[in-house]
Structure formats: C-alpha cells, structure tokens
Amino acid sequence: MAVPGSLAECGYIRTVLGQQILGHLDSSSLALPSEARLRLAGSSGRGDPAARSQRIQEQVQQTLARRGRSSAVSGNLHRTSSVPEYVYKLHVVENDFVGRQSPVTRDYDMLKAGMTATYGSRWGRAAAQYSSQKSVEERSWRQPLRRLEISPDSSPERAHYGHSEYQYAWRSHVVPGGRLTLPRYARSEILGLRQAGTARRPPGCGSFSDAVFDNGPLKPTMPTHPPGTSHSAGSLLEETTVRVSQARLQSTQSRTARSSWPRSSVRSSLREPGRMLTTAGQAAVGSGDAHGDRSVFADAQLGNADIEMTLERAVNMLDADHVPVSKISAAATFIQHESFQKSEARKRVNQLRGIPKLLQLLKLQNEDVQRAACGALRNLVFEDNDNKLEVAELNGVPRLLQVLKQTRDLETKKQITGLLWNLSSSDKLKHLMITEALLTLTESVIIPFSGWPEGDYPKANGLLDFDIFYNVTGCLRNMSSAGPDGRKMMRRCDGLIDSLVHYVRGTIADYQPDDKATENCVCILHNLSYQLEAELPEKYSQSIYMQNRNIQTNSNKSIGCFGSRSRKLKEQYQDLQMPEERSNPHGIEWLWHSIVIRMYLSLIAKSTRNYTQEASLGALQNLTAGGGPIPTLVARMVVQKENGLQHTRKMLHVGDPSVKKTAVSLLRNLSRNLSLQNEIAKETLPDLVSIIPDTVPSTDLLIETTASACYTLNNLMQNSYQNARDLLNTGGLQKIMTISIGEGYAPNKASKAASVLLYSLWAHTELHHAYKKAQFKKTDFVNSRTAKAYHSLKD
C-alpha cells in the first residue's frame, strides 16, 4: 500500500516491497532465545552466562557467514549506482567536450572515507552534480524501498546552464546567443486541421527520413509523417574511440582504458604522468598523417629492442605464422591507438585488409587478443561508414555476438558492445542489426541487467556491468529508428519493452532520473510509440478499436462541413467507452499503460537532462496523436488524472528550445480533445501567450514553436467565447497580429498559424465590441491574408 513520504521526500511516495524481498534478508537469527528456553538449556549444563555469550557469538558469526555467501552468489540485494565505475578511478579521466575539461577529482578511496564526490553527467548540455556521504559499500548494499507510482506534485529546481561550446562527430549549427547545439535526435510534427508539411531542418542536421538517427545529407524529397507525432530524426552518434596509453603499448597484459561513450565524440584515456590528455577536438587539429606519427615501443619478447612500429607492420603481424600471441595483441593494440585520433589511419588499415584479420582474431581463445581486436575494430569503424560496411559484409556481427555470449571478460564485452553501438549508427546496417543482434542483446544484456522479470533491481554481477548495459541501450536507441518494419520487430521482441520500463521505473524509484542509460531507454520507448495507432498488431486493433468501427456513421444528422474534423464526430469519438487496462501488461501493452504515462510525467518533472525530458514529452505527444480510443485515453489521463499540465507548462519556460517546442506540440495534441479544452485553457493560456515572440520569428525551431502555440490557442478559442475573452485580456493579440503580417509576401508557418487564429477569433460576435474598445478593427482579424490562411487549412 502506498504511503506518503516524509517532508524531505516531497513529490514522491513510498510503497512497501513484497514479502519475498524480506525473505532474502535472513537476519532473524540475531534474536536471542527466550529466557524460558535459556533456562531449559541450563538443565543441560549450558545455562551459565558464559554459555549464553558463546551462543550469541556463534549466531552472529553464522549470520555474517550467510551474508558473505549470499553476496558472492546472489545479486538480489545489490544495486548499481548511476555513477559508473570509472568515475571512481583516479587515474582515469574523461574529456567529453572541447572547451570544457572537468576531470574527476574524487576516487574510490575518498568515497570510502565518506567524502563528497561529484561528477559530470557527460550526456546532456549540463553537468549534473551528484554527491554521496556514504561509503560505496553502504550504497551498493542498500535495498531501495521506494517506487514512484504517480507524477510528483512539483518539479525540482531546474539547473542553470552556462555558455559552452561543444564539438561533435558531425556538423553542428549555431543558435542565437552563440551557443553551439547539436542537431536534435527528435523531430515533432503537430496534428492540425490537415496534415502539416515536413519541417525544415537546421543546417547540418541531415534529412527527415523515417530513420531516427540519420546523419546523411538532405534528400531531394522528404517523406511526410503522420501529423501530431514526435519523430526522431537526428543521429545518436557513435561510441567514442578509445585511446590507448603508451603504457598499454608496452604491456599487453594491462587493462584497456575505461571510458563512457556518450553520444558526442568523447575520448577517454588513461592518465599518463606529466602528459595532457588528448580529446577528439585536439586530435582533429593535430597531425593527421597516418605514417608521419610513428610509435616506438619496447616489446620484452623481442629482446627489449626498440622496434619502430607502423600500421603496415602491425597489420602483417596479425596473421603471420609463428607470431607469439603477445605480439599479436600488441599489434592490435597499436592499431587501436593509431586509429583513435587519425581518420587516415582508419582508411589505411582498411586498404591493408586489416579488418578481416582482426575479425579472424576473434576465434582465438585468448582474452587479451579478443579485447585488443575488438578495441581496434571499434576505433576503426568510428565515423567511417566504409569500415562499418566492411565489418558487416565479413559477417562480423554474428562473430562479435558469439564472443559476447562466450567471454567472461567485462572489458571485452564493453569493447564489443561499443563496437555494435558504432555499427548501429549506419542507416544501411540498422535492419541488419535488428535481424542479427536484437534478440541476443535483449536476452544477454537488457533482461538480466534490468532485473526483469524477477522484479529485482538493476544490478551488476560478474558477467555484466553498467557500461555494458549503457552501450547496448545506445545501440538499441539507434536501431529503434530503422523505420516501420524495425519498430514492429522491436515491439515484438519478448522482454525488451518490459525490461526497459522496469529499469526506468527503478531509477526513478532510486531518485536517479538523470541516469544516462535511462535517457537511452526512454528514447527507445519514444521511438517505439511513433505511429503506434497505425502499426498496432491486428489482435490489439481488433479488440481496442472495435468500438471505433461501430460509430454511427449512417446517422441522418449532419456531421458538419469539414467531415471528420467536425465537432459532432469528435464528440462521438470522445464519448466512446475507453478500453480497460490490463493489470499485468506485457510487451507492447506497456506503451500506452497508465504506469508508463506516470513514468513519463515523473521524468518530465524530476529529470534535468534535456534529452530525457524531450523524449518523455515526445512519447506522450505520439500517444496523444489521433482520434482513436488510445490517444483520447492518454489525453484524459495526462490532463485529468495525473495533473500532467503543471509539469508540461513548466517545460514551456526551460532554456532548451527543443524541449520547449515538444512541450507545445504535446499541448497542441491535448487541446484537440473538446472535453479538455477549458481545463487546458485555464491552466496554460498565459504560458502559451508568453512564449509567442514580440517580433516575427526567424529561426526554424522558433517558427515551429510559435506556430504550434498559435494552433493550440486556435483549438482552445474556437468553441469557447470565454477562452477568447481571456486571450484578449492577456494582451497578446498585438503580438499575434505582428506575426500574422509576417515578412511581406513570404509568410512562414508561424505567420500562417497566427492568421488562422485571428480569423477564428472574429467568429465570436459577442467580442466585437470588446475588440473595438481595445482599439482593434475588423480588418485586423479578417483580411485577404487571414482568410486565405484559414480556408487553406479547410481544403
């Protein structure tokens, strides 16, 4: 049963875990026997105080022994922190963005001593700060007892983001204010009076294809997507290449450099004494000659002689006869090192036919060789589409998956999953990845690490850790953009959606909404909710939409001059009895379930990661697009049951323009429900007016946001005289008229939307006197420009 939390936990509720969890604690042996039993035992000669003390010590020792065995065998009580392991390593530094270097300053020993540790989230545009006053052991053994089941009452204070510049693996564009932003992964189109056209992309963002993450050039023709849906269209990017230190070149027995691989071109390396770390941007401005920078390293097995290693020599050593395994590993490590910072080196290795040789090394039952080969391949395919295709054509994906299932070396698994992430960024390989890798990745990584279906919490064990799970979710995030067929296959994958939902709910319950793997999971769910109505399997559509087919379309009553857009038909749709929810949803049923709706609203309120917020808003936007039972059910749930408007309206005032645009798009979909319009207007009208600029918007993103705001206001004004009067009283009409005029003879979407709104406002004859009193005249509302815009939407 849910019970309110303490004042310190405002916005959350707690639920009691099931009895089966308590069964694992097994601490009842700490209780002493009753005095009666002690006296009875005394008759056997063991009732003296010394015997009693001995029994207590024996019981304590037995309990500690059981706990020790439990920790070694079972991970049921273990929970991973969202802070990756490499953060605690003092000698590992992560440089994520050029222009901002914030090496980790706290290590594992400091955490054990109870000192505060902070780290950058390395994923969004801000660096979220985390701290801990407990030891790592305490946090890893603490069993969380809270589950967030409703959207919190209020959102936390939003972090303030400063000016920073980012460098990415692909083109970026500059927004007003000089801030460099990466192209968004998500694109949204809004449900209007008729299908909206395809939005223009910012320069350098690629094409609006049905692939979620495309980084190719703009295509001559762009497909039109169903209006009202949120569609991902940017590139998720690839995993970063791994830089190998000089010490690694000298000893192939050392571990590969640990790193996290976020969506930007992040490079991680081992800290070298007295040497600055090299980031992707620094490498880019350095030497690009694959042969000019030659590394000299000592190999003990070559008699400690200094050998000048080149790419040619390294590639030749990969398959030479009678070459010791240690030299093969060293050669692969050298290739990994060289291809880290030089795109020319990646191309040169391909020309030397090094990729087939590296793939052949996967057959060797040697962890060092496999690890080095996978690391080299991961760097070779980074930002190199030809190398990606080469790996795929050589049947590399099945080989990698085979090693992933067989090896017990965590570092090798990290290299493989990082390599698969890079491969999945290629549009040409996404379907191949879904066909060959989806099932294995789900069964081998996603399900076991998430803790589903046992109901356990996300945990690491001897075979998996957070970085591996994070890499796989990044790979699946790319794969979820593979178009309709790919989405359908992923929805049908048994256990995938269940595990993703279970993991996200677990991080929310642990007060970790900014977990970077959570962002990946939510983006996958967002993509899988795209076009959900149209792509539902037949068994669901037959049961859920049967009532839709039985609408009285043969009624003699007129349904209005605009067909399916008329008010009467909308009322018939919305008067339908909503389909009942299953108490135990499975698979695709999670996508529209009330638990997931609350999960999205919780992330909107609690997360400070822009992409997590945008994906959550976009998923709700997808689910509310359309006129069937599911969109209507979700809209009512968001507005009436879960108090979702308060969280959505706050997103209208965030600094990130894409989050703001997606929030307006969601409100536009919600405003199409007649029964919700007055409530939406009461809650959000001042906010919608406030985000409309005073002048004609000039950027594509601001144009889209302004157009969505005007269309939302139009939905709210059409059927309500009071809402139209409230709009007049806000003082926003002058801004709307300014935007309606636009830029002469080339009106954009925003000016067209403003014109439609003005034309609709004049239809309220009761307000004509109020308009004139406010110094407005009829021609401000009805003229050739507004009439043309209004009637063009009705055609």
Curated annotation (Swiss-Prot):
Keyword annotations of the record: Cell adhesion, Cell junction, Cytoplasm, DNA-binding, Methylation, Nucleus, Phosphoprotein, Repeat
First and last residue of the signal peptide: none
UniProt feature, compositional bias: Polar residues: 245-257
Function: A component of desmosome cell-cell junctions which are required for positive regulation of cellular adhesion. Regulates focal adhesion turnover resulting in changes in focal adhesion size, cell adhesion and cell spreading, potentially via transcriptional modulation of beta-integrins. Required to maintain gingival epithelial barrier function. Important component of the desmosome that is also required for localization of desmosome component proteins such as DSC2, DSG2 and JUP to the desmosome cell-cell junction.
Composition bias, Low complexity: 258-268
KW Repeat (keyword) present: yes
Source taxon at top rank: Eukaryota
A GO CC term assigned to this protein in UniProt: intermediate filament
Name of the molecule in the record: Plakophilin-2
Origin species: Mus musculus
